[in-house]
């Protein structure tokens, strides 16, 4: 059924198709239809960050930026749902067109620019949802906030989403907000992580619970840079790392229609690069922090490869656009079939 739906949706512009799909998934969730229409994955519970996941395959941030379809996505069989990226204030994002399909490569290029309705609106949607599973909320900075004051935006969002989230992801790796990726390195990263850790401890006392913090990083880093990030995450007391966001690279898509568009490339072409980052992180972290792997999972076996590389959980987005809910089941089945260590 999804194959037919995709054929129809792919006749529309990518962003129109995205918005319509989100509306349909949200409506199906409100009516309780998605679970009946989609075969559910096998149960494969796992505990990570002190949280209990129904299965290790989650929805990556970016597909549901405003929390419009939380129940709908959960009913499709995801083991966890991550919404956002959300910013303190609403913002329109970059000018259109800003989303491009590369079907020959099972890939997408986007330069959305954190378009969202703001953190207050997102919280309204979270409160309206019935979903009681693991919910991640991905936070970022507004476009017009100077990078020197980015910490302020992250702390505003952290304060607001703290009690609503199962875990909180700090997005310092989108290539579509100028200067954002500089926060992954050196003193900028240390200052951000220290500020987040200090505020989180204050919030934990106030609210009587410690919400895990995950940092989402880019795939476009050297092994040495990745090692430095891993050390900083451990030193600051972060709880997980999400590897990875989209890539600025264009290997394998340069000659394709839209292959030269500016923005972040996701989907199949980022698989090897992203999985390499997971392997490097696993070696550096030595099991002290869990890794949530995202990037290039378009077949079930890719999810198993991420777990074999050292990840505890995986997330999908572009693969879901191309393959639909069946990819969730395939990924869960592939992970379940892995030899027990």
From Swiss-Prot:
Active site: 174
Assigned GO CC terms: cytoplasm; plasma membrane
Reaction(s) this enzyme catalyzes, per UniProt: (S)-dihydroorotate + a quinone = orotate + a quinol
Annotated EC: 1.3.5.2
A Pfam family this chain is assigned to: DHO_dh
Main location per the UniProt record: membrane
Compartments reported by the entry: Cell membrane
GO terms assigned for molecular function: dihydroorotate dehydrogenase (quinone) activity
Cofactors required: FMN
HAMAP family associated with the record: DHO_dh_type2 (MF_00225)
Family membership noted in the UniProt record: Belongs to the dihydroorotate dehydrogenase family. Type 2 subfamily.
Protein name: Dihydroorotate dehydrogenase (quinone)
Species the sequence originates in: Pseudomonas putida (strain GB-1)
Primary gene name: pyrD
């Amino acid at each position: 059924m999804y194959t037919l739906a995709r054929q129809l949706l792919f006749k529309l512009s990518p962003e129109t198709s995205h918005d319509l799909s989100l509306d349909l998934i949200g409506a199906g969730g409100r009516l309780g239809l998605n679970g009946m229409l989609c075969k559910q994955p096998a149960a494969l519970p796992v505990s990570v960050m002190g949280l209990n996941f129904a299965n290790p395959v989650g929805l990556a941030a970016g597909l549901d930026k405003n929390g419009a379809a939380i129940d709908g996505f959960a009913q499709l069989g995801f083991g966890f749902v991550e919404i956002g990226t959300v910013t303190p204030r609403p913002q329109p994002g970059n000018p259109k067109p800003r989303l491009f399909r590369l079907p020959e490569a099972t890939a997408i290029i986007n330069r959305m620019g954190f378009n969202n309705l703001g953190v207050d609106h997102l919280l309204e949607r979270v409160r309206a949802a019935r979903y009681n599973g693991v919910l991640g909320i991905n936070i970022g900075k507004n476009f017009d906030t100077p990078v020197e004051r980015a910490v302020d935006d992250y702390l505003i969002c952290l304060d607001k989403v703290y009690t609503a989230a199962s875990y909180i992801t700090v997005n310092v790796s989108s290539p579509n907000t100028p200067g954002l990726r500089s926060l992954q390195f050196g003193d900028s990263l240390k200052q951000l992580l220290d500020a987040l850790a200090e505020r989180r401890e204050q919030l934990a006392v106030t609210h009587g619970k410690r919400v895990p913090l995950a940092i989402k990083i880019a795939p476009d880093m050297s092994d040495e840079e990745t090692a430095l990030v891993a050390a900083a995450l451990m030193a600051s007391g972060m709880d997980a790392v999400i590897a990875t966001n989209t890539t600025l690279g264009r290997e394998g898509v340069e000659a394709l229609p839209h292959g030269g568009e500016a923005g972040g490339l996701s989907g199949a072409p980022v698989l090897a690069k992203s999985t390499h980052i997971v392997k490097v992180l696993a070696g550096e972290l030595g099991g002290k922090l869990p890794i949530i792997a995202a990037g290039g999972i378009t077949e079930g076996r890719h999810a198993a490869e991420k777990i074999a590389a050292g990840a505890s959980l995986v997330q999908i987005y572009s693969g879901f656009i191309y393959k639909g809910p069946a990819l969730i089941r395939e990924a869960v089945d592939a992970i379940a079939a892995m030899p027990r260590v």
